[in-house]
Amino acid sequence: MNYAIDKDAYIAVVKNGLASKATSILGPATQHYKGNDPYPYDLEKAKKFLADAGYPDGFETTLICTTTTSDLKQCEFIQQQLAQAGITVNINSMEKAIVSEKVESAEGPGSEVEVEMYMSGWSSSTGDADWGIRPVLAKESEPPKSYNISYFENDEMDGCLKAALETADEEKRAELYAKAQDIIWEECPVVFFANDYNTWASAADVANVKIYPDGGLNIRNARMNP
């Protein structure tokens, strides 16, 4: 699917140009970020991988998202893109509370969960690599404990996260998180689209308002310009 979705078109159509292509599970401003080459848009390669996996004619799946306008816009783009590779995507939009119940708080192993595809976003609110990876891809974070909705399990990656938390050596931590990011990029349990630009508007006479990566607003040092 990484090859079947045009990330440049996604940024232009869905994000109005206000994003950059993802090169890691982490955003570029996150501590210990290590970028990789984005997966290129290559429809023929996508079809070949599908055929090699036993789906020469594609398959049908359901993509779950919330009912927000932005989520639906993203899912409709994904639906159109994957159709060109032979994948039929049915969009199932739900209220956030229902999504939380059926997806994020699902009980039991991944094989028993009624989720085929799910569209979501994540950023490290702490600015640290661990919180950008562990909640969404560590084995210990499978629902209902946290948000590993892809039910990705990789002992080597989990080991990197564990070792990085056990050392205060920043050079060693950087190496471990770099390795974890490489594993994720190669295994690609998730299709990573883009890093949104944080954009906001304020009156010309307001200064020192800050926006955190998770969208939080910091007005602690806000002031009015004379």
Predicted feature residues:
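Append "and occasionally in soluble cytosolic enzymes with long acidic Gly/Pro-rich linkers
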Residues: 2-85, 151-153, 179, 226
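Bilobed periplasmic-binding protein-like "clamshell/Venus-flytrap" ligand-binding domains
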Residues: 12, 53-70, 110-121, 167-202
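Short, solvent-exposed loop/beta-turn-alpha elements that line the ligand-binding surface or hinge
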Residues: 31-45, 49, 53-55, 105-111, ...
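Extracytoplasmic/secreted cell-surface and envelope-processing proteins
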Residues: 70-73, 101-102, 127-130, 202-204
